[in-house]
Amino acid sequence: MSLVLKKSIDDVALKDKKVLIRVDFNVPVKNGEITNDFRIRSALPTIQKVLKEGGSCILMSHLGRPKGARMSDPKPEKGVRGYEEAATLRPVAAALSELLEKKVAFAPDCLNASIYVSKLKRGDVLLLENVRFYTEEGSKKEEEADAMAKVLASYADLYVSDAFGTAHRDSATMTGIPKVLGSGYAGYLMEKEINYFSRVLNNPPRPLVAIVGGAKVSDKIELLDNMLGRINYLVIGGAMAYTFQKAQGRKIGISMCEEDKLDLAKSLLKKAQERGVQVLLPVDHVCNKEFKAVDSPLVTEDVDVPDGYMALDIGPKTIHMYEEVIGRCKSAIWNGPMGVFEMPCYSKGTFAVAKAMGTGTQKDGLLSIIGGGDTASAAELSGEAKNMSHVSTGGGASLELLEGKTLPGVAILTDKEVKGRGPLLKCACGGASPSNESCPRRREGIWGGGFIVTEIVKLVGALLIGIFIGRRLNTKLIR
């Protein structure tokens, strides 16, 4: 993806404005209680900015995958179209109210909220009900998505996107509304996400290691292919490692393996070798005969998995090897766990990687980025999330960004016009970069070494021209 500088909420007046903010409040809810409020907390800086500047917030989000109803469907006698108890955002309104320490109004129908919007005053916050209760939100038919977008756009003066987690979706609330309003601004979370990914993809401190795990090679093909041209080390773990190991002729027992992807695995390993990327695969394993937790799983002595056993985590030798590689790198990006970390007996590999990255970040200045989804959950569970440079809120979005794809929800936002070269430059991704630490292009001077050389050449050229003209004038005067 070409990451282009985008206008943010710092670039627009917010006073007395009704600001429609697309947030990602797709949080886990159990028995009406939110079990992890990370995504809600991540949106607070943007909300607080609008309130501080004298605007009012209209928040919209999805939660889960409700079946939904069409806008044209008959309205039920009680309730709203498409409503599902398990997917209501009402618990989120209560949680947000506690975090903001102020009342958060709730509109039970996102497309019939005009009366709630009309009552908004400076500093007020309104949360709309789940936008996915209407199928038009994710409709592939442009006219349907546009119809929903027009209703939502009518509520507001400005549109702000802070939902990086759904930035890979071309939907009514991500792309339709800014199209209707003619502009769209990045919130602080969106800005931060793109800034960090731009840095690690475009100009990372080196060496750079990509740690890739998860179940299937097929899920990470595009990521691996795109990253091979950017990284120095590739660390592979999780079930996908055993497709690579079988491709190398190793014994993998009954471990998960994509038989139809063996040639692809060989091809990726060959490409890595051609590009000078060192690939590291597990050299020992934590195994069991069944996919279940046990008190004492088998730890192999070498790379081969015994017959009748499946590998469910990386072993201690592999952990040590991976820790050493992370320790010698300046940047690390991690997408996918090393094992079945949800079971404590198979969590050591994943948690060790998290610990190595967290320690490296705090002690040695490692640029560490966690790619959302299960990896973010693992980092949280390990207690190391707080020590990372950045933990992404977007699983699918971060994956597509690492695959080199364009994110529709980012591309639609208003481009930033950069005039001249001020002292505070911004990263080409849309993130503010007021310091050398946060902007990749400023680590070697204002625009890197190339810029400095160019300026020196210009100065020398101007000096030589001046000397030449001066000599000609002196010659004429003497004559």
Curated annotation (Swiss-Prot):
Record-listed E.C. numbers: 2.7.2.3
Binding positions (CDP): G214, D219, G238, G336, F341
Binding site for ATP: A215, K220, A239, A311, E342, D374, T375
Pathway terms, separated by semicolons: Carbohydrate degradation; glycolysis; pyruvate from D-glyceraldehyde 3-phosphate: step 2/5
Pfam families for the chain: PGK
Listed name of the protein: Phosphoglycerate kinase, glycosomal
Keyword check for Lipid metabolism: no
GO biological process, one term: gluconeogenesis
CDD domains: Phosphoglycerate_kinase
Reactions mediated catalytically: (2R)-3-phosphoglycerate + ATP = (2R)-3-phospho-glyceroyl phosphate + ADP
Species whose genome carries this gene: Leishmania mexicana
Extent of the signal sequence: none
Highest taxon in the source lineage: Eukaryota
InterPro entries reported for this sequence: Pgk_euglenozoa (IPR027250), Phosphoglycerate_kinase (IPR001576), Phosphoglycerate_kinase_CS (IPR015911), Phosphoglycerate_kinase_N (IPR015824), Phosphoglycerate_kinase_sf (IPR036043)
Binding-site positions, Mg(2+): A215, D219, D374
Entry's Gene Ontology cellular component terms: cytosol; glycosome
Keyword Lipoprotein belongs to the record: no
